[in-house]
């Protein structure tokens, strides 16, 4: 949100650009993305879910009756096939809200999984005050500790989930080159929050995400 306020101060007076408050972008992303996810599963699976709660039930039933890893893999593929574009991306606030919401959705559907399609069953992800929050079964906040195997698994999972969504699902265009730069920076910062150590001294390399955020009219 600080980047968004800077964006408004720098550009707003010149071209009428305004920062969208976090509670608005959070509400918009939650209401729209959840409906789109339900529609996409209905389209691909031939289901007739009317609500997100019905979708949760259908996925859990399929997990119980079929190969769990295959179900989780397909469900992730369906969500990762979504394409969300903001044609006036500004500082990227809406795209960040969508990024966090998609991860929260995967967590609620119990398909937020590591590279082996094993779920992060001991933690739940949700969006609070426009921030992605991860808590354990006792309500404790997740904190990354590289020497802890489970903590490392969770951090790597969140990093790669964000990377996948940023590279495949999120697109933005803006006529203002400064806003494009801020949007790119904002997405990089979201990814950096879950950067992890490949060994004791080396952090995982951040990907090139410029391809999805373009300057244009």
Mark where each language-model region is:
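AMP-binding/adenylate-forming catalytic domain of the ANL superfamily
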Residues: 210-213
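Conserved SAM-binding motif I beta-strand of class I
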Residues: 171-173
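Signature of the SF2 helicase/ATPase Hel1-core->accessory helical subdomain module
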Residues: 101-105, 189-190, 194
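Conserved SAM/SAH-binding beta-strand->alpha-helix loop
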Residues: 176
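Class I S-adenosyl-L-methionine
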Residues: 1-165, 179
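Conserved SAM-binding loop
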Residues: 183
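Coupling/hinge elements of helicase-like and P-loop NTPase modules
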Residues: 194-208
């Amino acid at each position: 949100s600080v980047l968004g306020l800077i964006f408004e101060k720098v550009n707003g007076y010149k071209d009428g650009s305004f920062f969208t408050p976090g509670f608005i972008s959070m509400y918009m992303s939650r209401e729209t993305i959840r409906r789109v996810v339900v529609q996409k599963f209905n389209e691909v699976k031939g289901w007739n879910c009317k609500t997100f709660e019905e979708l949760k039930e259908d996925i859990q039933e399929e997990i119980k009756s079929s190969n769990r890893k295959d179900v989780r893999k397909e469900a992730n593929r369906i969500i990762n096939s979504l394409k969300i574009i903001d044609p006036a991306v500004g500082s990227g606030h809406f795209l960040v809200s969508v990024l966090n919401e998609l991860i929260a959705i995967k967590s609620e559907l119990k398909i937020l999984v590591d590279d082996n399609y094993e779920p992060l069953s001991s933690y739940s992800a949700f969006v609070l005050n426009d921030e992605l929050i991860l808590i354990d079964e006792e309500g404790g906040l997740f904190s990354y500790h590289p020497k802890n195997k489970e903590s490392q698994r969770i951090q790597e999972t969140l990093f790669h989930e964000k990377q996948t969504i940023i590279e495949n699902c999120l697109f933005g265009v803006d006529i203002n080159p400064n806003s494009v730069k801020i949007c790119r920076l904002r997405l990089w910062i979201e990814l950096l929050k879950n950067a992890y150590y490949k060994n004791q001294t080396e952090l995982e390399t951040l990907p090139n995400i410029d391809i999805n955020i373009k300057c244009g009219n």
